[in-house]
From Swiss-Prot:
A Pfam family reported for this protein in Swiss-Prot or TrEMBL: Glyco_hydro_76
Propeptide: 429-449
GO cellular component, one term: cellular bud
Protein name: Mannan endo-1,6-alpha-mannosidase DCW1
Gene Ontology molecular-function annotations: mannan endo-1,6-alpha-mannosidase activity
Catalysed reaction, written as an equation: Random hydrolysis of (1->6)-alpha-D-mannosidic linkages in unbranched (1->6)-mannans
PANTHER family, A to Z: MANNAN ENDO-1,6-ALPHA-MANNOSIDASE DCW1
Recorded superkingdom: Eukaryota
E.C. designation(s): 3.2.1.101
Length: 449
């Protein structure tokens, strides 16, 4: 592996020295390898966890812990689709280190600040490692399937039936702003992980949980009815979850789309097959001339740091949906291929000449840059190979990761932990909430006018 890493890095450095922009020919595997190696190298420029005094698994500011989990999931896709193990040592070290003392992705450095959605994205990365048969950790370390099950179990224990008839709150802890909000990404991620665990393990309990979460989301109108299933942002317990925050984000649509695809592939149910197609129908809202974009914020150029990474997860979920549900392949691969070519043209900026941008419509770099931009370009490009690689493995078909159905339940519960909130704490939380509210109003005004 060390030899491969050295060769891989030398290849990237050579390409960097003599190449000004990413050139991509999707009919040429070597072209795709060269393009994605440049983008992956640029992504890892933001990684600081291998530097003295820094935290293993974490990227530079301003990138939060949850996005680090998303980034390692992206690098797993890069390894799998591009047959490139250059960064595998870093992936393993990061995902083990950040698992925490209880092996449930609630590490001490995040244990009072992380939300359900934050934990979920590390769990999704662990599930990907299990399904792709990624190198297993040493026997004395937690295994990928175990980690994914621990995330699912700890999240499921937080199911809040006392308000709005169920659902997960956005935040785990009462002192964090957003505790009174039940958002789609937390609930959609629980549904998504349950669907993947059902298929991998064959355990019906996970199917039951996926159906439970799905029906609750439909009941509070986070998922629309009809043949186009749009997915909305969240609801507040302050009004008994009766008013929907109607923003649509790519990664929320992708979580429900891919989760439905996993359930159809496992159960063979016509219902989940239909739902998969209906989520795919609604995904059209995120494409213009076949190119993916973040519709809620990209137009007014108001995407924040987190939102600039959402297309990465959407591309990932599109790719796996195409693997699992044959009827979706023509549409999805058309979107991925068109978007990949456009993304490559955007990767022509920065001092290195191949920094990726946010807006892929321009045919050139738009001046934006960051971890999210690199992740999005990389995911959309590597997932053009979705049909050239095996579908996710299961325990009965190629998967070797070892789990435990009770993983995570031995730890001290973190469900709705109490705290004596001071007036100062409430004031601080109020300021944060106000800022979020202003941002939402600004987006709404742009969408209307």
């Amino acid at each position: 592996m060390l030899v491969n890493k050295v060769i891989g890095l030398l290849g990237v450095l050579f390409a960097t020295r003599f190449t000004n922009a990413v050139e991509l020919d999707l009919d040429n595997y070597e072209s795709l390898q060269n393009a994605t190696s440049l983008i992956a190298y640029g992504l890892m420029d933001y990684y600081t966890g291998n530097q003295y005094g820094k935290t293993v698994g974490m990227f530079s500011d301003p990138y939060y812990w949850w996005e680090a989990g998303g980034a390692w999931g992206c690098m797993l896709d890069y390894w799998f689709f591009m047959d490139n193990d250059t960064y595998n040592d870093e992936i393993i070290a990061a995902m083990i280190h950040q698992a925490g003392d209880d092996n449930d992705y609630i590490p001490l450095n995040q244990s009072t600040t992380e939300g359900n959605d934050d934990q979920a994205f590390w769990g999704i990365a662990a599930m990907t490692a299990a399904e792709r048969n990624f190198t297993n950790p040493p026997e004395n370390e937690p295994q990928w399937l175990y980690l994914a099950q621990a995330v699912f179990n700890t999240m499921a224990l937080r199911w809040d039936a006392d308000s709005c008839g169920g659902g997960l709150r956005w935040q785990i802890f009462v002192w964090n702003s957003g505790y009174d909000y039940k958002n789609t990404v937390s609930n959609g991620a629980l549904f998504h992980i349950a669907a993947r665990l059902a298929r991998y393990t064959g355990n019906q309990t996970y199917v039951d949980w996926a159906e439970k979460v799905y029906e609750w989301m439909v009941g509070v109108n986070l998922i629309s009815n009809g043949t186009y299933k749009y997915v909305y942002d969240g609801v507040s317990i302050d009004d008994n979850c009766t008013k929907v925050t109607s923003y649509q984000w790519t990664y929320n649509q992708g979580l429900l789309l891919a989760g439905s695809a996993y359930l159809y592939n496992f159960t063979g149910s016509d219902l989940w097959h239909t739902r998969t197609k209906e989520f795919l129908n609604a995904s059209q809202v995120f494409f213009h001339d076949g190119i993916v974009y973040e519709a809620a914020c990209q137009g007014p150029n108001s995407c924040n740091t987190d939102q600039r990474s959402f297309k990465a997860y959407f591309a990932r979920f599109l790719g796996v949906t195409a693997q699992l549900v044959p009827e979706t392949r023509n549409q999805i691969m058309s979107w991925l291929n068109t978007s990949a070519i456009a993304a490559a043209k955007s990767c022509s900026g920065g001092t290195d000449g191949h920094t990726c941008g946010l807006n892929w419509f321009n045919g050139t770099w738009d001046g934006m840059y960051g971890l999210g931009e690199q992740m999005s370009a990389l995911e959309v490009m590597v997932n053009t190979r979705a049909l050239d690689k095996p579908a996710p493995y299961t325990a009965e078909n190629g998967g070797s990761s070892v789990g435990d159905g009770a993983a995570g339940t031995q730890a001290q519960p973190t469900n709705l932990a109490p705290l004596n909130i001071t007036k100062g704490s409430k004031a601080g939380a109020g300021i944060i909430t106000a800022v979020i509210g202003i941002s939402i109003v600004a987006c709404a005004l742009w969408l209307v006018f």
